Amino acid sequence: MEKVWLKRYPADVPAEIDPDRYSSLIEMFENAALRYADQPAFINMGEVMTFRKLEERSRAFAAYLQQGLGLQKGDRVALMMPNLLQYPIALFGVLRAGMIVVNVNPLYTPRELEHQLSDSGAVAIVIVSNFAHTLEKVVFKTQVRHVILTRMGDQLSAAKGTLVNFVVKYIKRLVPKYYLPDAISFRTVLQKGRRMQYVKPDVINTDTAFLQYTGGTTGVAKGAILTHRNMQSNLEQAKAAYAPLLQPGRDLVVTALPLYHIFALTVNCLLFIELGGRSLLITNPRDIPGMVKELSRYPFTAITGVNTLFNALLNNEEFTHLDFSTLRLSVGGGMPVQKAVAEKWETLTGKHLLEGYGLTECSPLVTGNPYDLKHYSGSIGLPVPSTDVRLRDDDGNDVELGKPGELWVRGPQVMLGYWQRPDATDDVLKDGWLATGDIATMDEDGFLRIVDRKKDMILVSGFNVYPNEIEEVVALHAKVLESAVIGVPNEVSGEAVKVFVVKNDASLTPEELLTHCRRYLTGYKVPKIVEFRDELPKSNVGKILRRELRDEEVKVGTTDAA
């Protein structure tokens, strides 16, 4: 496909980037730490951590992994925590030790956590005490030999940290009892690590930096193998696309999305580290009043988020009174940005809310709306520099402009494959091209629009939910005969999970089924709607047809609207 989008690029956005500007993320980080040593790198709960402190602490962390635990280059280390100052310390500590980061959603259930730890082969985990009870239930079933435990306030000043830890544990009671007798504290790791020798590993760009887990149409979470080069390429692509709105050494980005999410990891963390920017870490973005209070204290220049977050902010009275004069860049990703939200954002802030599109397998950025956009486009934008895309029909032929086809992507940000899953890798990677499973159209200027998802994936507030996983959990209930799961439109989260159930026992109630689901599934995966039916639509070979159920929902919605 001809790169028609290049002619729509702003004049100062290059067609290509240098994916090998740095030899590794280690070199990128160490250069930034030297260049911006005394400037703030991260802010959390009023505590400021400079680049110098981050360099010293991550070096100590790396040294302890190497000397204290005896871990080797290529070992996998899991990180399971929300946005705290401990996260970037551990992140860059693991990378600087030559090891591989395995990001884990701290809200995972024991079942989900066990799968990710076992599949990745993680030998160590860094976890915040709030979620230690989950780890306790499964750690003995995994290869994890070392547990590094931290508390919410452990990187705050002594007085503030003590207060935060007391409130979290005894007032809010957010730390359920756990028993991990061999765990070592994060503080002890840093104290001992400072006295140990750090040995800089021989890491090159093609080495793996992350196993970033994503679901699949089978419902089994798979680790996307992302190299140092993949991540650096995406960092450079984002920087090239939005450089005119960025000011190295002077930006402050609001980080409400969790850093374990690939979007925040690449854009908010890695990109703004390279740029010498400050990242304002929001630990609990669900507390909108608390978040707005934090925002009122800082003249932020950039913010990223999902549609759900922007909508919640716009509906907070205090947020509408903030000063947006310093804001230059607003980026929405993870789920479609709704027109009403984008227009309200522009009216309030005077800045466009630029929608982008990506997927874990692409580190994640694939497309983004240009920074000189004049109005909401409803599209996912243009392919970022050094990215090639094509739209193919079911026979593998390229479609004409304006016609729908499956979106395929090629570029330096595309993963190596799925960890230890060659068959799954072969299903999506062909001659360097990645099949996204999304159906899109492209106009004459190169703007892409997603019109459908080939996969059955449901997108809840930017998080992927896979029907098979939910159906497997529902099937564990003795009173369920069969079920089917689909996504339905939801004003708050974009989509919500709906489950259709054929009962095996007439006494089954929606409340009973949802209680069962909450035992096995993270909150955003738990169905919001339960509908009981006598039978489910099936193909002639007995396969349940989710498509028919989705079509029924569309018809009902259309009828209701009429």
Curated annotation (Swiss-Prot):
Query: What kind of membrane protein is this, topologically?
Result: Peripheral membrane protein
Q: Which GO terms describe its biological process?
A: fatty acid beta-oxidation
The protein's annotated pathway: Lipid metabolism; fatty acid beta-oxidation
Indicate yes or no for the key word Repressor.
no
Ordered alphabetically, the record's keywords are: ATP-binding, Fatty acid metabolism, Ligase, Lipid metabolism, Magnesium, Membrane, Nucleotide-binding
PANTHER family reported for this sequence? LONG-CHAIN-FATTY-ACID--COA LIGASE (PTHR43767:SF8)
Q: What is this protein called?
A: Long-chain-fatty-acid--CoA ligase
Taxonomic lineage of the native organism = Bacteria, Pseudomonadati, Pseudomonadota, Gammaproteobacteria, Enterobacterales
Q: Gene encoding it? A: fadD
